[in-house]
């Protein structure tokens, strides 16, 4: 009996050991490593040797438009609701993918001829191979590029949903030319980059929204690239801009803005989308009560979740289906609203219009 007891005890210890191993946390991948925290100095991120020369492009080259010593202290002119945790997440993502996250869109010969071209490029937030791509364009009044709040977070969230997203760093004085070059470069290198050449979207906030709308117009795309073989964007996603030009050649457009925006009037955006809708171009418009200019993803505000709405609009125009489930976590206590069959888990106060038809007001 003693021998049996010993064997049973040994078996129990073995099973307990196996159970303990099974409950051990998974090995953290490189992409999940914490290289930076809220207290990390911005200068340390920019000068991290892993980034090489392009580290200086992570934050605005035009230093007069931003302030702060650490990541949590970052402030950008004309922007509100900057999320320190998202800033840290973006920086850690870039550091984890430092070997392949930055792509030059101009050749070395071109940069030698025009040194200002060294202040350009795209940061690549990878999604699923051969999935559609988006180019995100930050605003900054055509004076600087506020990517850390107005394009990097958008690109990161899109990549989480399986889409390939590029955040463009452009020359403020030659923004349209640089976006045209980025579109051409990505389309020409689609196989190499592992992205679909068709069904892409252009995103932008403020000045970046003007860029997206302008290059989303097929006539402008052909004029600025000098080519007719490039496909037109399947959708343009715009935030807080006073852009008013309307054309039959414009892409389907999603737009959102805050009602307390002192720079870009929500009424101007609504009027433009109504004009596009009258031309038969698909549109979706949202205004958010009380929000000022430059709210970005709108985390913690009534606009939170707008990016998921915009993705669905893009899917509808491109004919694509969702690659991954939405990244937003829905709590049991959240109120669910429906907009034209679209479910939201955030309270959206304001005016919401799809193809010229008002859906609801909160």
Predicted regions and their residues:
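Residue-level detector of functionally pivotal "anchor" positions at catalytic/ligand-binding pockets or at interdomain
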Residues: 319-340
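Conserved alpha/beta-hydrolase "acid-adjacent" motif
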Residues: 262-268
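Short beta-strand element of the alpha/beta-hydrolase
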Residues: 131-140
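Primarily recognizes the serine-hydrolase "nucleophile elbow" in alpha/beta-hydrolase
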Residues: 177, 181-250
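N-terminal cap/lid segment of alpha/beta-hydrolase-fold proteins
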Residues: 52-129
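Short beta-strand/loop motif that positions the catalytic acidic residue
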Residues: 255-257, 261
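C-terminal catalytic histidine-bearing segment of alpha/beta-hydrolase fold enzymes
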Residues: 24-58, 279-320
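Catalytic nucleophile-loop/oxyanion-hole region of alpha/beta-hydrolase
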Residues: 146-150, 166-194, 298-303
């Amino acid at each position: 009996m003693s021998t049996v007891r010993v064997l049973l005890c040994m078996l129990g210890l073995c099973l307990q050991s196996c159970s303990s191993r099974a409950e051990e946390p998974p090995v953290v991948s490189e992409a999940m490593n914490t290289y930076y925290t809220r207290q990390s100095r911005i200068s340390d991120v920019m000068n991290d040797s892993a980034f090489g020369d392009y580290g200086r492009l992570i934050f605005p080259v035009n230093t007069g438009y931003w302030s702060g010593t650490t990541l949590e202290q970052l402030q950008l002119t004309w922007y509100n609701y900057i999320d320190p945790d998202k800033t840290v997440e973006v920086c850690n993502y870039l550091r984890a993918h430092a070997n392949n996250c930055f792509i030059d869109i101009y050749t070395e010969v071109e940069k030698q001829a025009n040194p200002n071209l060294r202040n350009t490029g795209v940061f690549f937030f990878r999604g699923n191979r051969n999935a559609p791509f988006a180019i995100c364009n930050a605003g900054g009044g055509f004076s600087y590029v506020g990517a850390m709040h107005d394009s990097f977070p958008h690109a990161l969230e899109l990549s989480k949903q399986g889409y390939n997203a590029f955040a463009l760093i452009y020359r403020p004085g030659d923004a349209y030319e640089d976006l045209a070059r980025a579109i051409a470069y990505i389309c020409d290198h689609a196989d190499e980059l592992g992205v679909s050449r068709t069904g892409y979207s252009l995103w932008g906030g403020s000045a970046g929204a003007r860029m997206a709308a302008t290059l989303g117009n097929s006539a402008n795309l052909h004029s600025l690239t000098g080519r007719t073989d490039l496909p037109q964007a399947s959708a343009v996603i715009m935030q807080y801009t006073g852009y008013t030009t309307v054309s039959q050649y414009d892409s389907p457009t999603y737009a959102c803005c805050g009602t307390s925006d002192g720079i870009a009037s929500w009424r101007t955006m609504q009027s433009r989308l109504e004009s596009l809708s009258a031309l038969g171009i698909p549109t979706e418009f949202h205004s958010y009560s009380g929000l000022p200019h430059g709210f970005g993803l709108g985390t913690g505000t009534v606009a939170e979740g707008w990016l998921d709405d915009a993705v669905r609009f893009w899917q509808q125009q491109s004919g694509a289906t969702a690659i991954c489930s939405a990244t937003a976590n829905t709590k049991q206590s959240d109120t669910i609203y429906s907009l034209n069959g679209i479910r939201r888990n955030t309270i959206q106060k304001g005016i919401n219009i799809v193809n010229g038809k008002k859906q609801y007001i909160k």
